[in-house]
Amino acid sequence: MENNKTFICISNYFKGADFLIHLKELGNTVYLVTSETLRDSPWPHDSIDEVFYMNGLDTDWNLDHLLLGIGNLMKSNKVDAIVTLDDFDVEKGTYLRENLRIDGMGQTTGRYFRDKLAMRMRAKSCGISNPNFCSLYNDHDINTFADTVDAPWVLKPRSEASASGIIKVYDKETLWIHINEMGNNRFKYLLEQFRPGDVYHCDSIVLDGKVLFSISSKYLATPMEISQGGGIFRSANIPYNTADDKE
């Protein structure tokens, strides 16, 4: 086909089968990069031109090896787009696009989606309400935050999804115990005021700066409750034009 394009799809979870099938049905060349542990998963191989397997789980992938592999593939294949199929793969896609100069979301923009500190700083600069927060770079800034912002607070990994790895603290002494335990990795976290209450999420499709579609949902149990007490993440759609939806 004249409009045939080459897509590299990345996923460290088994998902996106329908997307891969549809890409192939449109006449495109489809490559998949996934984890070796998913080799036996029921991928739609008839719709994939070739599968490449990376050792380790998500956080164990060697990005230099990934870059070298895709770079070698590009010696004889023009790559038009890199598509990440899972939230945890966003960094991989932005890393490859930046290094290989492929169109799409780069690392700076990608951090607004995956780096909680960058996300909050961006939202604040746009006038969007945030809980009070602080990076963990500077001791003076941390002490000022603890002395001026009411507890409880939460220490959050900047790169983890949802409420994974969050630590809730109630006083300054305990806060510093946790920060000191992080050692040189403390910069990977941020400090934020805990705000109790219901938690919502809004999913949307935006094209050329215009919101084409959006839907709001409410968690049936907050991510913090699930993280601390176990269970399954569940949410329910908010009916259109209700008070919660408009807010």
Residue ranges and their predicted role:
Residues M1-T108, H140:
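ATP-binding N-terminal substructure of ATP-dependent carboxylate-amine bond-forming enzymes
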Residues F19-L23, R120, N143, I179:
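Short amphipathic alpha-helical segments and helix-helix/interface helices
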Residues D40-P44, W61-H65, Y112-A118, G165, ...:
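Short, charged, surface-exposed secondary-structure boundary motifs
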Residues A123, A146-V169, R186-G197, C202, ...:
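ATP-grasp fold ATP-binding core
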Residues E173, Q193-E247:
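ATP-dependent carboxylate/phosphate-activation module, predominantly the ATP-grasp catalytic core
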Residues V30-Y31, N130-P131, Y189:
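Hydrophobic anchor at the start of a short beta-strand
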Residues E98-G165, K172:
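A conserved helix-loop-beta module that forms one wall/lid of the active-site cleft
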Residues N72-V79, D147-V149, N184-N185:
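Glycine-rich phosphate-binding loop signature in dinucleotide/nucleotide-binding domains
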